[in-house]
Amino acid sequence: MSNGIVIIGSGFAARQLVKNIRKQDASIPLTLIAADSMDEYNKPDLSHVISQGQRADDLTRQTAGEFAEQFNLRLFPHTWVTDIDAEAHVVKSQNNQWQYDKLVLATGASAFVPPVPGRELMLTLNSQQEYRACETQLRDARRVLIVGGGLIGSELAMDFCRAGKAVTLIDNAASILASLMPTEVSSRLQHRLTEMGVHLLLKSQLQGLEKTDSGILATLDRQRCIEVDAVIAATGLRPETALARRAGLTINRGVCVDSYLQTSNADIYALGDCAEINGQVLPFLQPIQLSAMVLAKNLLGNNTPLKLPAMLVKIKTPELPLHLAGETQRQDLRWQINTERQGMVARGVDDADQLRAFVVSEDRMKEAFGLLKTLSM
């Protein structure tokens, strides 16, 4: 491959791919192009930066220059890719263009910001760059509103509370983690957040934000208002698909790929948060690691399909951590919940009494791997 492989993106997915390619081929040309600095950081750490008093620069693990030298790469940081000419095998920016033999989209996902009046006042914490832009405001804020009670919203609510801030969490669902598990399973964490002092506004909706002399006025439904110093949107991620769409690739929720991570164009692949693998968007570390291993082989001439095992998802709420696996969001499961002082084990079984999902907490998390082996896929 004279032009080699071009990767758009520099996050966890792109880096895992580079490492796996270099294990097998030390010399194939690798070019990475990304809009950010390309410095490496651990994205899950963003859920704990406030309580740990970390600045954005503290998160950097490896600079772009060190990364390029270690893995023999051409890097183009702070570069926006504007177009892909799939027929000519060319990637274009405003001032440059790159030929490729194989192209990988690892463009990630962006935080969804609810379309309410004053939405520009909402902050997002989906990257080191985003945290850098708002770290002073977040550090100084005494009153924080978190919009969204999912995985990230719950982690942030606990972290800000542990940092001594007055935290309000709003969600239109009846319980936290509603898209991941039923109320009877999430209630243990919900109770712990309340005990810590997090003010939960469930079955509630944010209607607008307005800057005031003393902070930000948040207008809620049922004619309610609260004043805060910072508002964080934690309402989910949207795969970055605009570039793929302009290139004529098949798009659904993400960039559609098959079991080989190949898009609708034979020489273009997608990986990580931007990819939709056989109809599934899987924005978690383990499936990305496994996908990167398979894709590295396929880019180098193999024909290996991705086979994902049952995998754990970790909710990093230190006062009450959770691990979950399986189809925890299924509505037709019967939940068998065993709760004791040191933790909880919740098993979701189907009509045939087959284990389809489970959630474990605290000291009972050590039972997760045993349960994983008995999970029906």
From Swiss-Prot:
The superkingdom listed in its UniProt entry is Bacteria
* Segments forming a coiled coil: none
Pathways involved? Nitrogen metabolism; nitric oxide reduction
Cofactor(s) required for function per UniProt: FAD
Q: Respond yes or no to whether keyword Transmembrane helix is given for this record.
A: no
One MF term in the entry's GO annotations = oxidoreductase activity, acting on iron-sulfur proteins as donors, NAD or NADP as acceptor
Q: What class of enzyme is it?
A: oxidoreductase
User: Which EC number(s) does the record attach to this protein?
Assistant: 1.18.1.-
Alphabetical GO CC annotations of the entry are: cytoplasm
Keywords attached to this entry: Cytoplasm, FAD, Flavoprotein, NAD, Oxidoreductase
* One Pfam short name: Rbx_binding
Record bears the keyword Acyltransferase = no
Subcellular locations according to the entry: Cytoplasm
The protein's predominant localisation is cytoplasm
Q: Which family does it belong to?
A: Belongs to the FAD-dependent oxidoreductase family.
Cross-referenced PANTHER family: NITRITE REDUCTASE [NAD(P)H], PYRIDINE NUCLEOTIDE-DISULFIDE OXIDOREDUCTASE DOMAIN-CONTAINING
Indicate what this protein is called per its UniProt record. Nitric oxide reductase FlRd-NAD(+) reductase
Q: Which organism was this protein described from?
A: Escherichia coli O6:H1 (strain CFT073 / ATCC 700928 / UPEC)
Lineage, please?
Answer: Bacteria, Pseudomonadati, Pseudomonadota, Gammaproteobacteria, Enterobacterales
